[in-house]
């Protein structure tokens, strides 16, 4: 850091406030396709009964997605994205930029955190289905060789990957944690089939430790505490592709 020279603190001196916003991966990929410094969408900030409501609308010419996971596709990205506002939580967060000459500049201090989420729509559910289908395809494919393969590979009692997997299973009980995005994909796929699940069934479907699974479920789901669906989980409204049923008390 010392070798990079001076640090420009103009942003701190001007007390510039910035927002730290988490956006879906597909949205950042579509932004990257915008020509030059072109417009990517519109941000709307409004007051509703004293509460601040923020939403982002993606430009129509950036809504077409032509590939998913490197494979050709034809689907429209959701255009409407309401924000879920969050507090900074007593943290001091700053934003820096680095120029081509390695000069660091402090652009501002984070005054608001938020998550940009797609509004529930047919486009979003179709996109999720394609992503889930793509992620469920086998990474390795078998291919018949037309000649003898000569290598120096020798059989081993156990591969390093399996050894590491077994070690993780022992550390985390009987189940090893999978990548969070993979677990989310499995959950979305399950909720495509049924609206309600009890935790035991979701554990059987995902093969994940109960504590880890509940952490992820709390981000996308709601646990019903009364009515005919008591003790079951369902998706939060923003992730649903169906109309909400009226629940009995």
Swiss-Prot record:
Keywords: Acetylation, DNA-binding, Nucleus, Phosphoprotein, Transcription, Transcription regulation. Heterodimer of an alpha and a beta subunit. Interacts with HTATSF1 and GPBP1. Interacts with URI1. Interacts with GTF2B (via N-terminus); this interaction is inhibited in presence of GTF2F1. DNA binds at residues 227, 229. This is General transcription factor IIF subunit 2. It comes from the Eukaryota. The modification N6-acetyllysine is found at residues 22, 33, 137. It is found in: Nucleus. The modification N-acetylalanine is found at residue 2. The keyword Lipid biosynthesis does not apply. One of its GO terms (biological process) is transcription by RNA polymerase II. TFIIF is a general transcription initiation factor that binds to RNA polymerase II and helps to recruit it to the initiation complex in collaboration with TFIIB. It promotes transcription elongation. Belongs to the TFIIF beta subunit family. The lineage of its organism: Eukaryota, Metazoa, Chordata, Craniata, Vertebrata. GO terms for cellular component: nucleus; transcription factor TFIIF complex; transcription factor TFIIH holo complex. InterPro entries: TFIIF_beta (IPR003196), TFIIF_beta_HTH (IPR040450), TFIIF_beta_N (IPR040504), TFIIF_interaction (IPR011039), WH-like_DNA-bd_sf (IPR036388), WH_DNA-bd_sf (IPR036390). The keyword Transcription applies. The modification Phosphoserine is found at residues 142, 248. It holds the Pfam family TFIIF_beta. GO terms for molecular function: DNA binding; RNA polymerase II general transcription initiation factor activity.
């Amino acid at each position: 850091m010392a070798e990079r020279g001076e640090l420009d603190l103009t942003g701190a001196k001007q007390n510039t406030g910035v927002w730290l916003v988490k956006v879906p991966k597909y949205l950042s990929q579509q932004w990257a396709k915008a020509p030059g410094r072109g417009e990517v969408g519109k941000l709307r900030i409004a007051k509703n009964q004293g509460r601040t409501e923020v939403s982002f609308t993606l430009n129509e010419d950036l809504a077409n997605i032509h590939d998913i996971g490197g494979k050709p596709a034809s689907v429209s990205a959701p255009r409407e994205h309401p924000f879920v506002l969050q507090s900074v939580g007593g943290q001091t967060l700053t934003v820096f930029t680095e120029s081509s000459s390695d000069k660091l500049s402090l652009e501002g201090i984070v005054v608001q955190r938020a998550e940009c989420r797609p509004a529930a729509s047919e486009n979003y559910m179709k996109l999720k289905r394609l992503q889930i289908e793509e992620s469920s395809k086998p990474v390795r494919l078998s291919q018949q060789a037309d000649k003898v393969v000569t290598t120096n590979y020798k059989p081993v009692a156990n591969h390093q990957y399996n050894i590491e997997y077994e070690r993780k299973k022992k550390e985390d009980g009987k189940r090893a944690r999978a990548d969070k995005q993979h677990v989310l994909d499995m959950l979305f796929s399950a909720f495509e089939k049924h609206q309600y699940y009890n935790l035991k069934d979701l554990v059987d479907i995902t093969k994940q430790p109960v504590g880890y699974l509940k952490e992820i479920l709390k981000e996308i789901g709601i646990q019903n505490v009364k009515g005919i669906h008591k003790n079951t989980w369902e998706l939060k409204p923003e992730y649903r592709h169906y109309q909400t049923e009226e629940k009995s008390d």
